[in-house]
Structure formats: C-alpha cells, structure tokens
Amino acid sequence: MSSFPTAFSRAPSLMFTMQNLSNINSTNVRLGRLNNQLATGLDILRPSDDPVRSAAISTLDTRIEHTNQLLQNLNFAGSSVGTLDQILADAKNLVDEAASIASSQINSDPETRESQALIIDSLIDSLYSLSNQESLIGHVFGGSAPGRQPIIYDRGAYRFVGEVGGLTAALGTASNVPLTLGVGSAIGELSSRMEGTVNLDPDLTADTLLTDLNGANRLGVNTGIIEFSYNGGQVAQVDLTGAVTVGDVLDRLNAAVIEYESDQAVTVLGPSAFSVNNGSISVDIPAGNLEFFDIAGSSVASDLGLTNNAAVPFNAGNPDGIDLDPKLTWTSPITSLAGLGGTPLGSIQLNNNAATHTIDLSGAQTLADIKSAIEAGNTGVRVLISDDQQSINIVTESAGLQTHALSISEVLGGGDTAALLGIRTLAGSTRLSDFNDGDGVSIIEGRTDPLTGLVDPALNTDFEIKLGDGFTISIDLSTADIATVDTFVAAVNAQADAQLTAAGRPTTDFSANMGAISNGIEFNQSAALGAGGPIGIRPVNNSQAAEQLGLMDGKSGGANTLLRSEDRATIRVNNLFSHLLDLSEALKNDDTFGIELATKRLGISQDHVIQARSTVGGYSRRLDDEVRRQEDRVVFDQAVRSQLRDLDFAAASSEFAQLQLQLQAGLSVAAQSQQRTLLDFLG
C-alpha cells in the first residue's frame, strides 16, 4: 500500500509526488498483468515470465501436438484396417459359398454343373470387385502403392500388379502395422517357385560399390586406415575412409604404395599395380613381399581380403587377395557374370497368360537390361534378384487357368540362354514334387504278393511303354527315381536298357531324355520302330504317374520316333482367383476329378482368407490399444501442462481484490499528502 515516506523528515513536494506516482503505477501494472491472466486463464503470458516453466511447457506443447497427429493417423489407419476386415469377411463368405457349390457338385449331372459354373463366374466377378475396393488411404490390396488398382483383368486371367509389403505410417508403437495388404494376402499373390538354379557369381569390377560386397569375412566391408610394409621394412598407412567403390580403394592403394616407393627408394609395384581378378583385389609385385595389417580394433584390411592369408603375403606367386564375394545387382555387367562361363546370351521363349514371347537378350549389357527385356511387352512377369543375391528369380503375376501358366524354354539357335541364366522352368534339375502346381507325382510302391508276402514288381509297375513293333517296357518307379527330372530319365533308361538287353534287342531301340529346346520329357525310338507306329503309354495298377508326368497327353513327332510329354512344370499363381477359375472350368467340362481337386484347393484358399482376416484383426486390436495409449498420454501431458501454465483463479481473485484495495489506499494517501495548508504560503 502507498504510504508517506517517513524516512524523510523534510523533503521537497516533488519527491513526495514522484514516490506516490511510482507506488500507484506499480500497483496498476500488477493489476493489469493480473487482469490479462484472468482474461486468458494463463499464469504465464510470455516466456520471460518464467523461463524454466516456459521451457517445460514448450516441450509439452510439442508432445501434445505430436500425439494429436498420431491420433489422426490412427483414425485413418483404423478406417483402412476396418475396410480390410470387412472385405476379407465378404471374401470369406464368397469362398464358403464356392466351396459349398463344389462339394455339392461332385456327384451331380452335367446340366446342373453347367448352371452352377455360372454362379462361380459371378462369384469371380464379385471377388474382382472386392479386390479393387478402396479405403481412405487407397486400394486396400495395393501393397505399398495403394494409388494404383492392384488387380486387372488381362486376357482371361486376373493379374496382380500391386506391390510387395503394405503401406505404413507413423502410428506410435503400431508403426509397423500395414494399412494395406500386398503379396501374400490370399487375393493378391505372385507365383513363388521359379527360383534361379544358376549362381551367376559376379566378378569384382572397379565400379562395384563396397556396399555390394559380402567381404572376405562375409560381414560386409568397412573403410578406414590400414597399414602396409614391403619386405618387412618401414610401415606406412593408407586412409580408405570415404571410399565408395572398389576403384576408389584401388586408386588410394596405388597412390599410397607409389609414395612409399619414393620415400623408401624401393620398387614395389609392376605395371598393373593394383587391379581386380575375378572376385579379389590383385597386386602386381615383380619381386619381394607386400603385407597389409589392420590397426588395433579395425578389420578394414581383413574385410578387403588383404590380410586373411597373412602366412602368404602378396608376391609374384600370390598376387590375389581373398575373394570378396560380390553381390548380384541390377548394375552388374553381363561380362562380369562368371556363372555364364563367358558364353554369350541369345534368346529365350516365354509363355505366360496364354501368350508366347520370344525375347532376345543378346544385346543386354547389364542385369537391368535382362530385367527390362523380360518384363517388357506385357509379359506379366517380374524379374527379381534372389535373397542371397547370387541368382535371378522370375514370378508371374497372372492368376488364370492352366493354359495361362508360365513356362520358359529355349529357342532354336538361342544358345541355351534360359539354362545359362538358370530360369528354364523345366530342366534336368527340376524337382518332380513341383510338377502339377506343387502336387508332384505319385507312384505305386511297396505292394506285396498276398501269398508270399514279398514285394511283387508286377504289382508296383507304374506304366508301360509300347514301342512301334509292339514290344513293351515296364517302368517301376521308386521314391528315389522321382526326385528330379534327371533321376526319372535315368531310371527309365536303366530299366529300358535292362529289358531290351534281356530280350536280345539293341539298347538303341529306345531312350529317354530331357527336351533340348522345348519343355518336355522325350521318349525316342529308332526310325525302324517308328515305321511300325508311334510310342504308346499305358498306366498300370491304377498308377497316376504317367498322367502326372504329362506322358498321357504327350505329342508324337519325328515320323513317330518321338513322344514329348506335356509340360507339367509350368508355374501358376495359387490364389483364390485361380482356384475359382479351376472350379468353373471343371464344372463346365463335367470333370469330376477337376472338381475334387478344385474343392481341395478352395479349402487352402479358405485357410488363407481366415488367416489373413485373423492377422488384420490383430492389427485392429493393436491400433485400438495404441489409440487408448495415446489418449492417456494426451490427458496426462495436458494435466501436467495445466499445472505449469494455467492460472489458479481462486488465488488470482484474492490477489486482485487486495490490489484494488491497495490502489484505493495509495490514491487516498497520495491525495492527503498533497493537500495544501496555510503553512505552504508562509515565507
């Protein structure tokens, strides 16, 4: 409260006036600030009011803003996942209806089957519509590219052009929850079997990135400082920090050793200096020994294959370091692929989605050129680098009938290019378990004579081969015989040779082999036998082996000297679309076995859809949990911020009343102290 300054017994009136004004102004300032606080509800109006509390409030503001953004993201994510769940529920109902129809038609008549096929076709149309539905984020089956329609209809097949993986967003601890589904969702799927069978084994080049090396220790390659010496002399250092390519490493090593030669007055390097040889760094040393060392705690020289063989340093007899195992990349030059053995590439034939493409790879300079050539022209396939980055894989995008399946074969005069690249779909190394969309080949084995209890070869024969003159060769296959195409061909040739020899016939009458150009297993008979008639195949003991090997649907050629099997190693997309198409086709063709097979595969699709929906349900639960967690966090942060920032209205109201009283008292005292009396006019 303003008061008369008792410290001054005698003072000028101006001093009293200024003192009173100062006290009144101070009270007014405090009233003004408190008035602003009451109007805004804030205790801190500017950072300078309390820097410590202001810093804490600023941090809380940022956290609350971030959390609110997360809650918005979670809201969109929940909507997308909810749409996914509903679509998968509809797909489950659809596949249940299809499975019910399939089961009811196993013992039905042709007319009913044909009418039910129309219903299956309508279910396929419904599935096509479901697969292209959108949520707030985009197409739910588009994978990491939801802006593009994931399933397109292409020449009778349903082609998945979506991406691998799902779209993710900042969702707190649920950030790894995909908001869309891509490959592996039971609806969007690619084929998975065509894995390259040849290790292309790229050589080291100057342009090879250090990040594309597995390194001598198979742990990658680090950069840093390494040491070296010549003939046990002075040790010098070379800094490889910042090197990006193998060429960078070679240049720095060359420069360091040349400087070493000048400083030590010695000759270390030959004309080729540092270079690459196959997968290793190579050093041209006419004489003497060059050794490299790692400094303590480092593995740079070891990673580069310069020290792993310390017992034998670099010299004229040991110019190469340890192989650095370069990875296969799209920029790998064709000339660097040791797996090709230096053989030039030619052409391949690719059949997919009921279309045939002859692809010329002779002009390819890099692996990316091969990828572009194979994927161009609407072939409906994707070329991928294998997980171990040593070979290439090819997958088809089109889910259709068997006639739409993928096969890759050679072209006459094409130089066995498909086999060179390891992408021929039917080769000697192809597993018979991969035949018939993965159903494999079944044989009769282990049947015994009911009287003797011994295994009877006659009861285990799978099929007979009838030559042009009527001579019959019995083929009894074992489990070992049906491992690969090569083991099957070897078993047939061995049994045929034995039976021909026992009958006093030349073994040249018959032979089996893998087709050199076209995909198929070939049975050959001599021209003389071909004049008598074509090669015939007859299943025995109800064995399905001949049918599953494609021999029953084989084609004759070469004036009846050749029987080439149907290609049963084609590659298909096994998803709900292909299974429904198979069922529709089987119903239209009155194919009981096909209906049974489609029913079995629909059961697999049911499991996939159920599993996908369960997974999406788990995602939804995680999103709900994260929403609750973030909401709790916002409430807590807002409570803490309120304690730091907001005004205590009760205390502020009391203080406001006190300041009003103080102002009133100050004004009163000032008025009284400034009153004039008679004494003011006495001289």
Predicted features and spans:
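Threonine/glycine-rich low-complexity segments that form extended coil/beta-edge repetitive scaffolds
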Residues: 89, 96, 167, 173-251, ...
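Structured core elements
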Residues: 168-170, 176-178, 282, 382-384, ...
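Short terminal interaction segments
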Residues: 2, 135-195
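Amphipathic alpha-helical polymerization modules
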Residues: 1-152, 244, 248, 255-263, ...
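Extended non-catalytic domains of envelope/secretory-pathway proteins
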Residues: 250-252, 279-280, 300, 369-376, ...
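Acidic, small/polar residue-enriched beta-strand/turn segments
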Residues: 135, 230-232, 261-353, 386-447, ...
